[in-house]
Amino acid sequence: MGGKTSESETVVQRFTELLDEQDYGKAADLTSYPAAASATMKQMFEGLQSGTVDYEASQVIDLDKQSAIFSMEVAWNFGEKKDWTYTLQGTVRKLAIGWRISWEPAVVMPQLTDNRTVKLVRTTAKPPPKVVDLPGEALMTEQTLNVIKIDPSRTGDLVGTTNALADAIEPVAPLITGPSLMQQLAGSQGQPIVAVNLRDGDFAILEPRMAKVPGVVMEKQPKLISADRRTRSPMLDALRKVWQDSLDATAGWGVQIFEADGRFVSQVAGYQGPSGPDIAATMDQRLQRAAEDAVVSAGTPATVVAIQPSTGAVVAVAQNSYATEKGPIAFTGLFPAGGTMELFRTVAAATKNKPPQDVTVQEAAEAATALGVGVDFKVAGLDEVTGRISAPGRSTEQVRQGAGADAVQVSPFGMAIAAAAISRGSVVPPMIVAGNPGTTDTPVPALPQPAIDRLRAMMNDGINKPETAALRGFRDVTAFAATGGADGWLLATMGDLVFAVHIADVDSGDATSRLAAVLLKSLATPEP
């Protein structure tokens, strides 16, 4: 602008400096309407709070002694490759109190008005990727869910509200009761709670009854859920994390303008690239449903984990409601190894070239890693533990030295990996996404061939024992059944499929085999 700085230039320069500092209060004082300017600029900086900005006066032209026009170049940065630039024009006038910027919201940002707001948002590619199963069918898709909440501030009778809502949703959510909702509210510190999420079909039927209940709030939210409501598994939560990671990796950004009532006006800046590829999950939904049929036949916590030993693909993970109350115990539950210690003892005997009866508890525990138990696998999206062993010098997955079988605690996931190692002849890294096997920093010793031969013989012999009689009607099945305290274990193989069964508080020695028989029968039965 050169030459002697005029009063109009001085005001514009000071205005840009204060905007750069995001000092909206002092910047507003340089306008003709400080209250409105302060409110607008406060919202702008809060809505774009992660950004930095540079306002630069590019030109100020005096029209006469009382007014001037100016231009500003504005550059926002919201992170790497997230830049937005624009040019603004405005007027500055000499008032009784001095030179002031003639206020209008568009003097700081295009398309702003007194009633509009601006916000920096994260954007996602459309359509989002879906999760497909092993055969390539849709496993999980993003759908609009109807989120049913209870807002305690909107009802004077919480007991009446919770009981009425529980009655209304009972046809689709029989486990949600008035007392269980009251328990949720007791821990919510007066905040609304989510009672249930409903698919559109269920919502359409139940909405009239729910709408009459005081304190019930109904909202629509997108969520990744199973394409088939029959498919339920803790593995879905892990796949949801993988899907979210994909969304994060392809996320874009946008500066968006909204009306006072929240209606979207336009996006004035931003970029959104293409969506990521579909997530290729390893789950086989037909096998998963068979596993679900099996676990619900048990009256105590029961889990099934099935793996394809040729690839390490986790093809099914099922828990009954009793198990789910305790969390994703198929992956993270730890239980005494019990009689399955004989498998580890067999490995130790072959490795150390000594009779099994001479193998110590400590040696058997240390041999568990050769079957993948006690190995810390890092599997995308999955929180898991294979087991905890009392091995000196091993800083992870340790417990105090126990007596006998208590020296090793195992998870159903870990025992499925052990079954896969017996079938394959070596530990195979597990995976829940095709082509993305787990990794580990834990040294995994090779299985000696004599150990492999003996372990397979134990599985072949096991199918002829009384406790596995329920499985003898199925072709090519081998099995090893054992108990650990009051719990039952079963490791089974059938061709390129292995699975581990765990049941807490078994009622008989053949409980795990009977559950496995339900699985195999369901798998052999054509679906309608």
What are these regions (language model features)?
Residues 1-17:
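Short, low-complexity N-terminal intrinsically disordered segments enriched in polar/charged residues
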Residues 2, 14, 30, 34, ...:
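Second-shell loop/turn segments in exported
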Residues 9-10, 24-71:
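Short solvent-exposed beta->alpha transition segments
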Residues 70-79, 479-484:
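Short beta-strand segments that buttress and anchor functional surface loops
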Residues 71-73, 100-104, 119-125, 129, ...:
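Small/polar-residue-rich segments within soluble enzyme cores
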Residues 81-121:
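Short beta-strand edge/turn micro-motifs at domain boundaries
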Residues 108-125, 139-150, 155-159, 253-354, ...:
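Short pre-catalytic segments that frame enzyme active sites
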Residues 266, 300-334, 347-507, 511, ...:
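Beta-lactam-recognizing serine transpeptidase/beta-lactamase-like catalytic domain environment
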